[in-house]
């Protein structure tokens, strides 16, 4: 097989935070089993062995949640042991982890650094913005713990990105958020659209990101980013980087920006495999990694159905001048009714207005980084 990438949930939906906008919480609430607990050692070894035996060239293990840190440091030390044990083909192995940061201490930071993990740290901006939606299970603020995690990552030279969820509130404070990240010298940023629960009415929650708010957010963020670029202070913002890749290469490395789905091989802690992190539902369970090869999982009827359903292009997109840049966007923003065709992207108008506003400057950046 070609190189393989997995998204793994070692603690299932378990988390020590209770973020108001958590999309995975809403997904797990709609499964027969809300949480599968911590991944057992036999599942971990079976997964590692299978991937290293079947992949060619390199492979990627990306740990998410819930909160993956809840699996414990010993779990990840065991992961490293198993990767060494079963890597007979001498593959290049990439490990990454997404965390809320509240449980990071010196030992965790040291481990992540020594084992070259790329880390995504969830932080929504300065204290008053971050704490609005990201509280722990007791309703307590989490900002100081997350800021401490960032300091430890810098101390131990852990490579990390900042993951910022864009809500109605954060969209209105993009200047304050960007300045804060700049003051902290965070150079790699991902701004992630806040998702309303799947198949619920969009825009009904206080945190819901409405199209008009997203339009303003993109324009304001781009102005700040572009000014820094002109001043020789380039900041990596994943969405803008993805647009530049599309302009220069015809496609993006970011999932959701190429218009059609691929199989992401999302592995729940019991070994169940799903095609996408946004669809870890009983309906889309492909099988179990303990019982099936990666090729068998990929070739299931459910996976083919999931991927094929993303191919249909909306009639509005066919005549849109921005389609080659947008490609219809992420499936999750086109899916509003269960068992029906995908619709026009919820943020279609936002993207149209943003492209009209920013495209000439995007081309200028692209020409300067060729």
Curated annotation (Swiss-Prot):
Residues binding [4Fe-4S] cluster 1, per UniProt: 15, 19, 22
UniProt binding sites for [4Fe-4S] cluster 3: 317, 320, 326, 348
Domain Radical SAM core, residue spans: 1-227
SUPFAM superfamilies linked to this entry: Radical SAM enzymes
Keyword Iron: yes
Record text on cofactor binding: Binds 3 [4Fe-4S] clusters. The first cluster is coordinated with 3 cysteines and an exchangeable S-adenosyl-L-methionine.
Binding site for [4Fe-4S] cluster 2: 255, 261, 276, 330
GO molecular function: 4 iron, 4 sulfur cluster binding; metal ion binding; oxidoreductase activity
Class of enzymatic activity (EC top level): oxidoreductase
Pathway: Protein modification; sulfatase oxidation
Keywords per UniProt: 4Fe-4S, Iron, Iron-sulfur, Metal-binding, Oxidoreductase, S-adenosyl-L-methionine
Record field: catalytic activity: L-cysteinyl-[sulfatase] + S-adenosyl-L-methionine + H2O = 3-oxo-L-alanyl-[sulfatase] + hydrogen sulfide + 5'-deoxyadenosine + L-methionine + 2 H(+)
Cofactor(s) this protein requires: [4Fe-4S] cluster
Catalytic residues (positions): 277
Residues that coordinate or bind S-adenosyl-L-methionine: 21, 66, 122, 134, 195
Pfam families in alphabetical order: Fer4_12, Radical_SAM, SPASM
Function according to Swiss-Prot or TrEMBL: Involved in 'Cys-type' sulfatase maturation under anaerobic conditions. Catalyzes the post-translational modification of cysteine into 3-oxoalanine (also known as C(alpha)-formylglycine (FGly)), by a free radical chemical mechanism initiated via the reductive cleavage of S-adenosyl-L-methionine (SAM).
Membership in a protein family: Belongs to the radical SAM superfamily. Anaerobic sulfatase-maturating enzyme family.
Protein name stated in the entry: Cysteine-type anaerobic sulfatase-maturating enzyme
């Amino acid at each position: 097989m070609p190189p393989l990438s997995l998204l793994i949930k070692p603690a299932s939906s378990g988390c020590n935070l209770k973020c108001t906008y958590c999309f995975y919480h809403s997904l797990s609430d709609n499964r027969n089993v809300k949480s599968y607990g911590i991944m057992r050692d036999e599942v971990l070894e079976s997964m590692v062995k299978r991937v290293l035996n079947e992949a060619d060239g390199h492979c990627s293990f990306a740990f998410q949640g819930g909160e993956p840190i809840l699996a414990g440091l010993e779990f990840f030390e065991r992961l490293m042991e198993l990767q060494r044990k079963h890597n007979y083909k001498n593959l290049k192995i990439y490990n990454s982890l997404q965390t809320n940061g509240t449980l990071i201490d010196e030992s965790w930071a040291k481990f992540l650094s020594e084992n070259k993990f790329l880390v995504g740290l969830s932080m929504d901006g300065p204290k008053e913005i971050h704490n609005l939606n990201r509280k722990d299970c007791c309703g307590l603020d989490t900002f100081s713990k997350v800021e401490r995690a960032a300091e430890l990552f810098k101390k131990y030279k852990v490579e990390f990105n900042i993951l910022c969820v864009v809500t109605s509130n954060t969209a209105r404070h993009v200047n304050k958020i960007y300045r804060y990240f700049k003051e902290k010298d965070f150079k790699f940023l991902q701004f992630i659209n806040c998702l309303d629960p799947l198949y619920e009415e969009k825009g009904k929650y206080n945190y819901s990101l409405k199209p008009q708010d997203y339009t303003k957010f993109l324009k304001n963020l781009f102005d700040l980013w572009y000014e820094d670029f002109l001043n020789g202070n380039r900041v990596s913002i994943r969405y803008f980087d993805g647009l530049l890749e599309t302009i220069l290469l015809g496609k993006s490395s970011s999932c959701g920006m190429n218009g059609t789905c691929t199989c992401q091989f999302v592995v729940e802690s019991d070994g169940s495999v799903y095609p996408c992190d946004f669809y870890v539902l009983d309906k889309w369970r492909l099988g179990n990694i303990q019982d099936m090869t990666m090729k068998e999982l990929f070739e299931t009827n459910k996976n083919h159905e999931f991927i094929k359903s993303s191919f249909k292009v909306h009639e509005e997109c066919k005549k849109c001048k921005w389609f080659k840049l947008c490609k219809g966007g992420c499936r999750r923003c086109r899916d509003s009714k269960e068992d029906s065709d995908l619709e026009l992207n919820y943020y279609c108008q936002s993207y149209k207005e943003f492209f009209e506003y920013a495209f000439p400057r995007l081309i200028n950046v692209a020409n300067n980084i060729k």
